[in-house]
């Protein structure tokens, strides 16, 4: 027997019963970002490897260990995108979107990282990315956070996701803090785990993001970045917190919050849940004013966020009822009337275009069809058999309430269904 081919580890199939949750989520994303007049942009899933090395940082875990990189037939080093911001900036520069312009952009699509797969973490994963360009200051950051909260409310998730904030300050203040942190960690280097000792010499701020419980007491005593902020950075962060307070958006300041990408400055934020274990971050973002210039464009203030759709779907399944709704399941009694049943179902769709109607064309027994009708979650079963064809009637059975079934003429069926909704 020929061995079957399996999906690549960490790259899962999305099956039909899961799609309604994805569709609900994607539609909510599009609705919310459109309400703020952000415009969609699409760019390739494959970019030159140099793009990510320059933006994400060569000393980051993503570039060092997680990127899917290959050499094409022309000898060029290419990479499947591990995140969307770098590609969005590249597209903006290449197509002149940032030249003396303000841009509000969004995208939705797959990203790729070679991480250890577990619940909420996959090697192919989907993100909603939202990016703003040309606007400095805290107000646009507040708008991004307001947008996130509006999305959680649209999804019914606002009670299980909370906001954490921090500031990385300007590059000057962050460099001063970096030196103080390195000095502190070097004095306690023997207490660090192997991964943190490696990061100490490459990307020391990432040690603050360690999930190792044995390191938490040591990190709690580490210097705090907020103590190294210059006056400009302090005013920026204070204004953002004031705006969130005025809008009654609850948040906590997390001094150990850093982002895994080197290009962030000033504000960083994460939306976190306690319902997904270790993969509790469902959305993260911040400000990255130096990124456009880093990629060869004109100095342009920028901010944005990315939300992980797989993790949001996991949360959705816990709070939303089945989203795969069927209004009518058409039971066709006997192979002799399948064609008539199919044509009548199509006529129903013409006059009830908003209704979801499924016709059973299997030719199987009534018992089997009613089992499928009940399992489908449909509100009504509409029975069409030889007797109904002869008398120009249908039998309508309510599947969710214990009420007598009705025998209706085809003319009265439509008005009855509309009245029952």
From Swiss-Prot:
- Stored InterPro entries: aa-tRNA-synth_II, aa-tRNA-synth_II/BPL/LPL, Anticodon-bd, Anticodon-bd_dom_sf, His-tRNA-ligase, HisRS-like_core, HisRS/HisZ, HisRS_anticodon
One GO biological process from the UniProt record?
histidyl-tRNA aminoacylation
Alphabetized GO MF terms? ATP binding; histidine-tRNA ligase activity
The record's section on Pfam families has: HGTP_anticodon (PF03129), tRNA-synt_His (PF13393)
**According to its UniProt record, which reaction does this protein catalyse?**
tRNA(His) + L-histidine + ATP = L-histidyl-tRNA(His) + AMP + diphosphate + H(+)
Q: Which PANTHER family match?
A: HISTIDINE--TRNA LIGASE, MITOCHONDRIAL-RELATED, HISTIDYL-TRNA SYNTHETASE
Q: What is this protein called?
A: Histidine--tRNA ligase
